[in-house]
Amino acid sequence: MKLDNDIFVYEWTNPMENNCNSFFIGGSVRALIDPGLAVFLPDLLGKMAEEGIDTDAIQYVISTHSHPDHFEASAAFTGNQNVRIGLHSEGITFLNGMGGRMYGLFGLDAPQVDIDMPLEEGPITLGGEDFEILHTPGHSPGSISLYWPARKALFPGDVIFDQNIGRTDFPGGSGPLLKESILKLARLEVEYLLPGHMGIIIGSEQVQRNFEFVINRVFPYI
């Protein structure tokens, strides 16, 4: 679904199977955010093609964290010299240890991915557009949120959802760190909240109300 100029949303709505929401930033950027599980990648690419996106022209594959339902399909882009694959440096370390072993809990093998774009907190330019990487751990070590100031679009992965938050009971999870990450994101000017699961939130007032709900109603249970 085309949300706005150059922002495409692919919500995962199948309650019988786990996967994540995926996003594509078009224009000069051509970045796929959170490609999801490998088994569902052909379906995702097919939906993108139906909307006129040349999937062979993808320049970046960026995962908000290394959990299987967000990252596994990145392996399909390894070896493609035209695609850079991004993950936070702490996420890479986690993936090479406990995070990789986590895949076995889901009956999967850890993917072999050549991550040639280690991400760090701070500004980053993608296809001539200015973005910001925010290190937002708590759900998983090395979790990031991608912020596009020009569009006031935030891709928080599994940090915050619509009236909910990402789990903290997976290996490397931390309730206190997740709270810090959410408070950090709440200070941003956001028009589009595009989370890793559940629905998207559009409108600055609605986004702010969601942050307030999570802080006031959900924080006491973290």
Where do the model's predicted regions map?
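Active-site HxH/HxHxD metal-binding segment of metal-dependent hydrolases
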Residues: 37-43, 49-124, 213, 217
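Short, acidic/turn-prone active-site loops that include or flank metal/cofactor-
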Residues: 15, 90-92, 160-161
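Conserved beta-strand hairpin/beta-sheet module of binuclear metal-dependent hydrolase folds
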Residues: 1-51, 145-157
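Short, flexible loop segments at the rims of nucleotide/cofactor-binding pockets, characterized by
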Residues: 8-13, 36, 61-64, 131-134, ...
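Short, well-ordered secondary-structure micro-motifs
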Residues: 22, 96-99, 205-206
